[in-house]
Design a protein with these regions (language model features):
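C-terminal/peripheral segments of proteins
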Residues: 1-580
Length: 580
């Protein structure tokens, strides 16, 4: 709509930031090399500068905290205190619903409900304007909002409107905000206090991870998870695209009680991995399953082989780049193309390159470049004829599990899904591979497959927040974005590096990933490591602007000063507050 009104810059600024979930896991003391509990976490956000996070150590007579904080949020969001380590990852459940409302053409503020007509609430919001004054002919903005029983109206004509229900609106009494929940976590010393601090949290749901100095681990889901009227629906957690507001179908009737949310203390496995489906199978979760499955497999292998991993192994796992669909893609290509004479020598050379590939998406791999181009070509050729280019772009950018569609296509070989110009699955694979090779060839500007590198196509640009709201100024102020950085991985690897699927110059550009990594071993206060993408400072001329980038790229995390000895050793400056 903003594009239609010729405000493309504003549309870009208000568009949802990329990034799907985060990685997080805890390991109990019985499984670790140090005999202390581990917490490993990497939070996924858009790659920007300055970074969304800053590292801090806070100490007062009754409390010592260290870890990653966010501007405007008091305390530490992911980190530790003297007794426990804590972190959180987003829980991707449906927390927003849209309702179609019927309004009376004779009485503009009356809308239809299951029991008859009701009056919409009219609210006037005053938006402060800086330097507003009658002297300069400016004043605060007044904006009228209509609100139905479902929530505020987003768009309306004479007889119909769309209302938004969201968990952040109209919270019940005796609930606390996310900032208050984090404050309580910061002061928790054990599992009971950890759970108690989350019990009344209301807002977007998260999975909160726990580890303590006694070797215990746990997790607790918390937040507002709406339960819906099940009339005509498969289950109470499932959302519809657009609910008829006058019927009652899909109305929010309650929130899932805290006692019924998934949690565990010292799980029998000896570890827990966030963002993976647990026992509540009826709750739809918008997940990329491959990353969590890979972490689970690695931890399960350690346990099966009676190996005791240390923090270095956890750091390597955070940077894991194994492509989950590599065996399937290689087998599919070999079966379809290896038995045909319909491809040229150039494509055979590319096929040989991907056949010899080890399945790891390193930045220097030619096989990785071909793999990425192929799976993107497959999903686009399936979706675009049915959805159109624009809607296919929206789907691929908003759905983190699009590669699961590719997996299903390659496994089932269902001819009904093929584009109209294809008659057989084999022919579809051959032409898709040909297009994938062509795309890599154009991106790499080379005719030699052995010279192609995934990192040459897959680069991060740390976009300045100043330019995100005004992309039209990029040609003039693009220097604020800094240099691009080649990376491996993709959206499916543990080292999650999500890239654009849009055709054109932005294709393969890496847009989001782990903007912060944390590793904590609670057996030793000096075994606390954390790394940001760039650095602590937003000043382009500061030595601290990008001094962590090399450590972040090479998976060599930096120590965080928590013990007095390490604090004295690595600190350059200290800010001391007194009561005088």
């Amino acid at each position: 709509m903003l594009n239609r009104w010729r405000w493309p810059s504003l549309a870009s600024a208000l568009s949802p930031a990329p990034g799907w979930g985060s990685n997080g896991w805890v390991v109990s003391s019985g499984m670790t090399e140090s005999k202390g509990a581990y917490l490993a976490l990497d939070r996924h956000f858009a790659f920007t500068q300055p970074c969304d996070w800053y590292l801090v150590s806070l100490k007062c007579p009754s409390l010592h905290l260290a870890g990653a904080a966010m501007p405007g949020v008091p305390g530490v969001v992911n980190g530790r205190n003297d007794r426990i380590a804590f972190g959180l990852t987003s829980l991707k459940v449906d927390v927003q619903d849209l309702f179609l409302e019927q309004f009376s053409p004779q009485f503009p503020n009356k809308y239809k409900t299951p029991t008859g007509w009701a009056n919409a609430k009219e609210i006037v919001e005053e938006i402060p304007v800086r330097f507003s004054s009658s002297l300069v002919l400016t004043s605060n903005l007044l904006h009228k909002v209509l609100e139905t029983r479902h929530g505020p109206i987003l768009i309306k004509n004479d007889e119909n409107a769309v209302a938004l229900s969201w968990v952040g609106l109209n919270q019940p009494e005796k609930t606390i905000s996310c900032a208050e929940a984090i404050y309580r976590l910061n002061h928790s010393a054990n599992w009971a206090q950890f759970q108690s601090g989350l019990e009344h949290y209301a807002g977007s749901p998260f999975t909160f991870l726990f580890a303590d100095k006694d070797g215990h681990i746990g997790y607790q889901q918390a937040g507002s998870i709406p339960e819906r009227s099940t009339a005509g629906k498969s289950n109470k957690f499932e959302s519809c695209l657009l609910n008829p507001g006058w019927v009652g179908t899909g109305d929010w009737v309650a929130n899932l009680p805290f006692k019924d949310m998934e949690h565990a203390f010292d799980p029998a496995e000896g570890y827990y991995v966030a963002n993976f489906r647990q026992s509540r199978t009826e709750m739809p979760l918008n997940l990329n399953v491959y990353r969590a499955q890979r972490i689970l497999n690695v931890l399960a292998t350690y346990k099966k082989n009676a190996q005791k991993p240390g923090l270095p192994e956890m750091a390597l796992l955070q940077g894991d780049q194994l492509a989950p669909l590599a065996p399937l893609v290689k087998r599919t290509l070999a079966e379809a193309i290896g038995k045909t004479d319909s491809i040229d020598a150039f494509q055979l050379s590319a096929l040989d390159s991907i056949g010899k590939w080890d399945g790891v998406l390193t930045e220097n791999s030619s096989g990785a470049a071909l793999y990425e181009s192929f799976i993107r070509t497959v999903v686009r050729r399936i979706l675009e004829p049915r959805l159109g280019t624009n809607l296919a772009n929206e789907y691929l950018e908003r759905y983190p599990g699009w590669s699961q569609v590719v997996e299903r296509i390659l496994l089932e070989k269902n001819s009904e899904w093929l584009p109209s110009e294809e008659r057989t699955f084999k022919g579809f694979v051959i032409t898709s591979f040909g297009q994938a090779v062509k795309d890599v060839r154009l991106q790499s500007k080379s005719d030699e497959p052995s010279s192609w590198k995934w990192g040459d196509m897959h680069k991060i640009v740390f976009e300045s927040e100043l330019l995100r709201g005004a992309p039209d100024l990029a040609p003039l102020l693009g220097v604020l974005n800094g240099q691009s950085v080649a990376v491996g991985g993709d959206q499916d690897t543990v080292s999650s590096m999500e890239s654009s699927l849009r055709r054109g110059p932005e294709q393969f550009v890496c847009r989001s990933g782990p903007t912060m990594r944390i590793l904590i071993d609670l057996s030793d206060s000096e075994k606390f490591y954390q790394t940001l993408t760039l650095g602590q400072s937003s000043n382009l001329l500061s030595n601290a602007h990008a001094d962590q980038l090399r450590s972040w790229l090479t998976l060599k995390p930096l120590p965080i000063a928590f013990s007095p000895a390490l604090e004295e050793k690595i600190s350059e400056h200290r800010l001391l507050f007194t009561d005088r």
